[in-house]
UniProtKB/Swiss-Prot annotation:
GO terms under biological process: thiamine diphosphate biosynthetic process
UniProt-listed Pfam families: ThiG
List of catalytic residues: 95
Binding locations of 1-deoxy-D-xylulose 5-phosphate: 156, 183-184, 205-206
Biological role: Catalyzes the rearrangement of 1-deoxy-D-xylulose 5-phosphate (DXP) to produce the thiazole phosphate moiety of thiamine. Sulfur is provided by the thiocarboxylate moiety of the carrier protein ThiS. In vitro, sulfur can be provided by H(2)S.
Family designation: Belongs to the ThiG family.
Primary location: cytoplasm
Encoding gene, per UniProt annotation: thiG
Catalytic activity: [ThiS sulfur-carrier protein]-C-terminal-Gly-aminoethanethioate + 2-iminoacetate + 1-deoxy-D-xylulose 5-phosphate = [ThiS sulfur-carrier protein]-C-terminal Gly-Gly + 2-[(2R,5Z)-2-carboxy-4-methylthiazol-5(2H)-ylidene]ethyl phosphate + 2 H2O + H(+)
Domain of life: Bacteria
Source organism per UniProt: Gluconacetobacter diazotrophicus (strain ATCC 49037 / DSM 5601 / CCUG 37298 / CIP 103539 / LMG 7603 / PAl5)
SUPFAM superfamilies per the UniProt record, alphabetical: ThiG-like (SSF110399)
Protein name per Swiss-Prot or TrEMBL: Thiazole synthase
EC number: 2.8.1.10
């Protein structure tokens, strides 16, 4: 799958926050065979020595890095954070987050479009964290985005795909745009469902990091993403409102 001209080895993207230890994080990334890891500038900057150790570990994993603007609530804050992240992580990829509501962490679609326009003009390759809003999606594409990352549910909620209709509509309206379900996924079955809907990748963090065994859960998500993709490519049957016999009646004894 190509994202801004770069082919990723896996359709599973993995966040790097909230793990019990750096060693477990490293093992989880390997178990997931992640195509991308997301990182926060705030973590890198939290302590110079700790930040350097974290960044060194991430580099040693050899996985493409997608910095984010997590925690930003204004356009100015998000743009400033993105520029700082480009300097620190040496990449023009940015997962753009502009939070509009503190309780649900719902994206501010108006601010997101404005920030995406500014950052695209500044040479960034923007991965926008968005709602499943069709009009907002169109505006983000017009602003220069070539990837869309709609939420499945609020960040960290584990509720899965709250609005399957909306996610399916996005896929239908933008068949040629890479789409990634980002946020709210709690179980491997949620990830498989996203792939079955036609999405190109999923981004997981809390569901792996906070699991009782993050490394095994990372492997479970890897297998689920693979299963969902294979199922989609196998042309699954459509739902029916009525039963359809699966056993042939030819040759069956008939009573008068």
């Amino acid at each position: 799958m190509l994202f801004y001209g770069t082919e990723l080895k896996s359709r599973l993207m993995l966040g790097t926050a909230q793990y019990p230890s750096p060693e477990i994080l490293s093992d989880a990334v390997r178990a997931a065979e992640a195509g991308v890891v997301t990182v926060s500038l705030r973590r890198e900057s939290a302590g110079q020595r700790a930040g350097q150790a974290f960044w060194s570990m991430i580099r040693d994993l050899g996985v493409p890095v997608l910095p984010n603007t997590a925690g930003c609530h204004t356009v100015k804050e998000a743009v400033t954070t993105a520029h700082m992240a480009r300097e620190v992580f040496d990449t023009d990829w940015i997962k753009l987050e502009v939070i509009g509501e503190s309780d649900t962490l719902q994206p501010d679609m108006f601010g997101l479009v404005e920030a995406a326009r500014i950052l695209s003009r500044d040479g960034f390759k923007v991965f926008p964290y968005m709602t499943e809003d069709l009009v907002g999606a169109e505006r983000l594409l017009q602003a220069g985005c070539e990837v869309l990352m709609p939420w499945g549910a609020p960040i960290g909620s584990g509720k899965g795909l709250n609005n399957v209709f909306g996610l399916r509509a996005l896929r239908a309206h933008f068949p040629d745009v890479p789409l990634v379900v980002d946020a709210g996924i709690g179980l491997p079955s949620h990830a498989a469902q996203a792939m079955e809907l036609g999405y190109d990748a999923v981004l997981i963090n809390t569901a792996v990091a906070k699991a009782g065994d993050p490394v095994r859960m990372a492997r479970a998500f890897r297998l689920a993403v693979e299963a969902g993709l294979i199922a989609r490519e196998a042309d699954p049957i459509e739902e029916r409102d009525m039963a359809a016999p699966s056993t042939p009646v030819l040759g069956r004894a008939m009573l008068a």
